[in-house]
Each structure stands twice: as C-alpha cells, then as structure tokens.
Amino acid sequence: MSNPATPRLCLVAITKHGAAQAARLAADLPDADICTSAKFAATFAGLYNPLRAYDGALRDEIGPLFERYDQIVFFVSLGAVVRLIAPHLRSKDEDPGVIVVDDAGQYVIPVLSGHVGGANEWSERVADLLGAAPVLTTASDVGRTIPVDILGRHLGWRVEAPKINITRVSAHVVNGEPIAFVQEAGSADWWTRPTPLPDTIHRFARFDEVPLDRYAAVLWVTHAEVPQERWDALKERLVVYRPPQDAAA
C-alpha cells in the first residue's frame, strides 16, 4: 500500500442506485477513480474523476483493483463483496482497505483492513460526505481506546514488538484491564479521539516509575534501548514505540 495520507482510492458501482450514490461521493472526492458497469457509465457524466467502464463480470476486476488501490469503496451488497474479494486476500499488512456502502447510501461498513489499512478512518469520512452512518466493529474503535498496532502512526512512530505481544496487549486494552502508558519521547499529540483517554490507561513519564505488578501490560514510547532481560521479564505484556529520532514527533 502507498502512503495512507494520500491513498489511491476507487469507487465501484454495479447498479443504478449504487452508481448514483457513487457519483454523489465522487463529486466530493475528485482524486478518486471510478469503476462501474458500462451500463451505468452515463451516471458519471460531468465528473472529472478517471472512469473505467467494464463490460464483463465484476469478479474479473477485483484482482487489478487490489493491485492498484489502497482503498476500494464498493456500492455493492456486503455478501457479494465478501465472495468477490475472498480469493484475493493475503494479510492485513498487504490488503487494501475495503468498504461497502448500501444502495441507499445509509450505511458505510469497513470490511477489510479497517485498522492497519485505514478503512475504518475512511469509512467515517465517506459516511460524513454521504450523510450516512459508519458501522465500525474494530474493538478499539468501538471502545474509543488505544489502537495498539497503529498508535502514533500519524506521527511517524514505529511499533517494536513481536506480533504475539501486539495481539496479547491489544486484548488487555480492549478488555479494559489496567495499562501503563510510559512516554519518554515523542509528541504528546498521540491521542486523536474526541473522547477522553480511558481511565484504565495510566500515564507515566519514566519506565522505572511503573509498579509492573499492578498492570496487565505496558506501552512504552522511548528512544532508549530495551534490554532483552526486560522483554523476557514482561513476556508478552510489552509493546515499544519508536518516535522519529530527528523530530519532536
């Protein structure tokens, strides 16, 4: 995937009403491409968005869409999209964000790569533009808590931890267990939600201040070297974040 700040975006429509909704959205997203059945190409007349009007089956378009785009917004039924994309799935680190919008433009559902791929964030943006309701199911987004795997990504932070640590610590966070958040480096503007930080997240300025026996996990933002014995002592309870060395963030 390319830079999530400037994603390659495609709107896909296969029905009359879906094309109408896609055209409405495309007017607000001039950088988005459009992929539609040739039958409904005229719906997009007057728009400046690049348009691909195909004559065959939508299933033949999915592979190229997955290769070319970072976010794909389908104005297609959820079940159909699941069946169409299934043969093309690789991993959450490689797959594009996939979003589904119903033909009436009432609901926007992130289906694939909601967190790491940015589909959750884009679903909220699409919903806002359409006047629709975003339907998010990612636990940290629904619970308005820390997204362990992508925390600080907008600031250039790099996550340093085995995947099992990220999985275990994410579970502790979304289950509302006590979490120590230690920030020794990086920008203080890492919390971007409109809601307050959950009261289960306790902040510390130094790792040595943390009474480790009181916390299910530790999130540590630092430039310091983490000795192997510390990883071993905390087992799967530690995730480290590395802010850029040459910037305040």
Please name every model-derived segment.
Residues A5-C10:
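Extreme N-terminal starter segment of soluble prokaryotic enzymes
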Residues D60:
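Nucleic-acid-processing active sites and adjacent nucleic-acid-binding tracks
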Residues V12-A42, G46, R52-A57, L65, ...:
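Conserved mixed alpha/beta catalytic, RNA-binding, or beta-rich assembly cores of soluble enzyme
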